[in-house]
Each structure stands twice: as C-alpha cells, then as structure tokens.
C-alpha cells in the first residue's frame, strides 16, 4: 500500500535528486513533488514511509532541519488536492495548497517542533529473540534485509547490518516469529549470496547468566574481603591506645615544661638565699667584732712588766 510523506522547511536549493538521496535505503520511491518551502514523497510501502519518518525527522537537508509527517488524502483529490497531517491528538493541519506561494506561512505551526505521532509498529526495539545473519552482501542494507523478511510474513522489531563485515542482526517479538524467519529465510539468495541465519537467543541467555553469576561471585568475594578488612581494622584500633591530637600533646608538653621550670626555680631559691647573707658587707678591719667587744682586751701597757713601773 502506497503512502505519502510531507516534508516541511525545505530550502529552494533542494532538488529531486537531493530528496532521493536523502531517502535512499528506505524502500522504493514512487513520486517526488516539491513546492515552495515544502514537498511530498510517495513510497510504495507504507511501512517504509513510517520508518523514514521515524528515523529522518529533524535531520538536516540542504542546511535546514526538515520536518517529516504522514499525509493522507482528504476527499480523494489528486496530487494537487488537499492533504491533512495527523498529530497524536488527531489535530488536522490546513490543506496543502497546490499553488506555489505562501507555503512557508501556512506551515509555521510545524516550526514549534517535530510531530509527535508514533509509528504504527512502534519504535524499533531490541529483544532477546535474536537472529544473526551471516554471508550478507555489502550491497544489502538493513532496510533491504528487513523488507525481505517482511515479504515472508514476519515482522522484525529491530534490524542492523554490517557492524561486523557481512553480518546482520534481526530481533523479533516472539520465539514463534524467530522460528518462522529461520524456516523461511535461511538459505535465501540475496544479491548472489545465500544467507545463513543462526538463532542467537540461547547464546545471549547463557552469556547473561554467566555474566550475572560471575558478577555475583565477585561481589560476594568483595564483601568478604571488606568484612575481614573492617574486622582487622577494628581489632587493631581496640588494641592500640587512642591517639592523642597534636593540640593535646602540645598543651601537655607545654604544661610539663612549665612545671619543670617551676620546680627548678623552687630548688634553686633556698641555695641562693644563704649566699645572699654571705655577700652582706663585712665589718671594717678596724672595728671589733661583737665577741671582741664583750671580752676585755689585753694591752701591753697594762702589764707591769712591760711598763717598767714598779714599786721601785
């Protein structure tokens, strides 16, 4: 079923070749219609149009970020008839005129931001039901591979190609879709090569389980180590006396030095006091001492023999 896309914010420099190059890899394009400031692109498959809107909306084209939206014919007009674009709330956009002028003024509401309409199939998402595609030609893109799988009646939820040379990855919503894809597409000839499909869901599960087990083991080991370290630290802390802060040690050392200096002063003070008494000025040589004052002094004149005076 064909589908048409509206392109807003187109510059005058963009040509049909630029449009075809912009949408390359998103399926077959039927028609390109360019207007002044906007345009339309018609795809053969509606799903290709939805993928293009989802992936390319807001991308740069000709130096401007273009706006992509779905367009539906209103009332069966032709290429020049009116089309309406639907937002999430079902709001209608004014009809696209087939004339040339004033296109940018009519669609100023698109300048507020990209449309919020989601794809019918939802956004691409990866699942654990995965298929690895080998021997894929380098000329086959992920979109081409996805289209081939769709033609077999299976809808992939996610596709990527050539992250590894000649390999691709497909994801599916259910295991039954995965099996159907392998049954119908394994050995298919694409561009001269027979592709090989391998179920990768079991490998992914085993890897995730082994990773989770190894992580849990490593975590338990780390916890044991941390517990042993904490216990040893607590024991060493309890055995060793508590450390004193620098301030306390400094203050205590100062108080000890002060007390020592005070003791030294006290011990020195009694030894110095008698010395002070000894240092007192001695009496002059001519003066008598107190002991001599009390005792009578003998003089040579007092003795009778020395004086020579007698009774004679």
Swiss-Prot record:
It comes from the Eukaryota. InterPro entries: Nucleotide-bd_a/b_plait_sf (IPR012677), RBD_domain_sf (IPR035979), RRM_dom (IPR000504). Its main location: nucleus. One of its GO terms (biological process) is spermatogenesis. Transmembrane segments: none annotated. Extensively phosphorylated on serine residues in the RS domain. Residues 3-73, 129-202 form the RRM domain. Keywords: Developmental protein, Differentiation, Growth regulation, mRNA processing, mRNA splicing, Nucleus, Phosphoprotein, Repeat, RNA-binding, Spermatogenesis. Signal peptide: none annotated. Residues 69-125, 196-312 are annotated as: Disordered. GO terms for molecular function: RNA binding. The keyword Chaperone does not apply. Residues 103-121 have a biased composition (Basic and acidic residues). It is found in: Nucleus. Residues 74-90 have a biased composition (Gly residues). Pfam families: RRM_1 (PF00076). The keyword Repeat applies. GO terms for cellular component: nucleus. Residues 206-259 have a biased composition (Basic residues). Plays a functionally redundant role in spermatogenesis and growth rate control. Belongs to the splicing factor SR family. This is Probable splicing factor, arginine/serine-rich 1. It comes from Caenorhabditis elegans.
């Amino acid at each position: 079923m064909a589908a048409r896309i509206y392109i807003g914010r187109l510059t005058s420099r963009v040509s049909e070749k630029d449009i075809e190059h912009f949408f390359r890899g998103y399926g077959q394009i039927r028609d390109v219609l360019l207007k002044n400031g906007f345009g339309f692109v018609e795809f053969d498959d509606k799903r290709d149009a939805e993928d293009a809107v989802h992936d390319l909306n807001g991308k740069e084209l000709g130096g401007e970020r273009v706006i992509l939206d779905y367009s539906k014919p209103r009332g069966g007009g032709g290429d020049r008839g009116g089309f309406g674009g639907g937002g999430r709330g079902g709001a209608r956009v004014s009809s696209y005129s087939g004339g040339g002028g004033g296109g940018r003024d009519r669609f100023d509401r698109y300048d507020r931001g990209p449309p919020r309409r989601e794809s019918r199939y939802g956004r691409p998402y990866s699942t654990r039901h995965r298929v690895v595609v080998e021997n894929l030609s380098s000329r086959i893109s992920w979109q081409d591979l996805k289209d081939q799988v769709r033609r077999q009646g299976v809808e992939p939820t996610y596709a990527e190609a050539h992250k590894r040379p000649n390999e691709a990855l497909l994801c599916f919503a259910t295991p039954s879709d995965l099996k159907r894809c392998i049954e119908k597409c394994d050995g298919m000839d694409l561009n001269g090569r027979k592709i090989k499909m391998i179920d990768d869901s079991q490998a992914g599960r085993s890897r995730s389980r082994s990773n989770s087990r190894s992580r849990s083991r490593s975590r338990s080991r780390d916890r044991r180590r941390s517990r042993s370290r904490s216990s040893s630290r607590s024991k060493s802390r309890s055995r060793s006396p508590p450390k004193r802060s620098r301030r306390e040690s400094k203050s205590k050392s100062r108080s000890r030095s002060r007390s020592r200096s005070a003791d030294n002063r006290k011990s020195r003070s009694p030894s110095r006091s008698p010395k002070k008494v000894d240092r007192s000025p001695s009496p002059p040589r001519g003066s008598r001492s107190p002991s001599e004052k009390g005792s009578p002094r003998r003089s040579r004149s007092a003795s009778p023999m020395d004086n020579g005076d007698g009774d004679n």
